[in-house]
């Protein structure tokens, strides 16, 4: 359609069928249809406006005039068909559906919807029947007009489906963004995990530094006493079963109040408290106590995690993350330190295997010393071990 129907003065556009042309505005008031040069199925409708006139002029005058007359008759038949205004209307709706912003709150926003076209068909049918019949005397032309209207109608429906899918996707995406996502909880967990990691690093470093300090202390005491237990030991000797139970109590006490031996320095004490995570001290002590009581298998089950979460007031995820970090930051350094102590000392003796020590609240160092030649190595636990307070 090289030129709009309402640009032709002898047809009058939509005014010729009784539908006011201002119902949807005049989108062609400030522009005109650009010529289409790439169509090669025939010469243009208005040959006097385009450079293709050279081809028509090259033909014989009688042949050129006959072609132009045939095209003019076909064009006049299409433009004068009773259904042409309806075809032009749905074409405008398809064009508006792709270029007009769709605002649900704006008046006239549904002008290009398929429902509005149904109303336009009803209005058009009433008006056209009162003036002239819907079809012409050419059945082929009637069929062409009906098929063209149906194709544009299907196109309008497809455009409406695309808009509906786009709106649905946008609505679901916005609802997902506005949903209650536990972002604050995730951030808290991450911060808690990082701070607890730093706390565990500090404490594990303190645990690894203690054996060397205790060995020096032990060597001094053994030199002074000639390898015999000091007077502060009180002669409390126990068997292996009692020794194990006392060791467990000592571990629990050390967990309740961990210390580095440098608490006299207020700056280090402040730094240690600054590095403490958001976990309460009571909760950390409970989990550390459980860890040291299960050093042979420091992997709590799901039921034990739930119980620890109830006891500490933390979430199961926080408890799980803490034990993951603890196995890497606390248990592994203790194992490495024990292996180094074995490799640096005498050959391995099951009666005197070195083991790291712990410090009590009152700055009194608690060590487990086995009598005999192994006493010079410091923190040793034997079958005949005894408590020794430095």
UniProtKB/Swiss-Prot annotation:
Location within or outside the cell: Nucleus
Entry's transmembrane regions: none
Tissue: Expressed at low level in normal immunohepatopoietic tissues, including the fetal liver. Expressed in a subset of myeloid leukemia cell lines, with the highest expression seen in those with a megakaryocytic-erythroid phenotype. Also expressed at high levels in the cerebellum.
Feature: compositional bias, Basic and acidic residues: 190-202
Gene Ontology MF terms: chromatin binding; DNA binding; DNA-binding transcription activator activity, RNA polymerase II-specific; DNA-binding transcription factor activity, RNA polymerase II-specific; RNA polymerase II cis-regulatory region sequence-specific DNA binding
Domain MEIS N-terminal, residue spans: 108-192
Annotated region (Disordered), positions in chain: 190-279
Sequence segments annotated as region (Required for transcriptional activation): 335-390
One GO location term (cellular component): transcription regulator complex
Matching Pfam families: Homeobox_KN, Meis_PKNOX_N
CDD domains in the record: homeodomain
DNA-binding region: 272-334
GO biological-process terms attached to the record: angiogenesis; animal organ morphogenesis; brain development; cell growth involved in cardiac muscle cell development; definitive hemopoiesis; embryonic pattern specification; eye development; hemopoiesis
Annotated function: Acts as a transcriptional regulator of PAX6. Acts as a transcriptional activator of PF4 in complex with PBX1 or PBX2. Required for hematopoiesis, megakaryocyte lineage development and vascular patterning. May function as a cofactor for HOXA7 and HOXA9 in the induction of myeloid leukemias.
Disease: Restless legs syndrome 7: A neurologic sleep/wake disorder characterized by uncomfortable and unpleasant sensations in the legs that appear at rest, usually at night, inducing an irresistible desire to move the legs. The disorder results in nocturnal insomnia and chronic sleep deprivation. The majority of patients also have periodic limb movements in sleep, which are characterized by involuntary, highly stereotypical, regularly occurring limb movements that occur during sleep.
Family listed: Belongs to the TALE/MEIS homeobox family.
Protein name: Homeobox protein Meis1
Organism: Homo sapiens (Human)
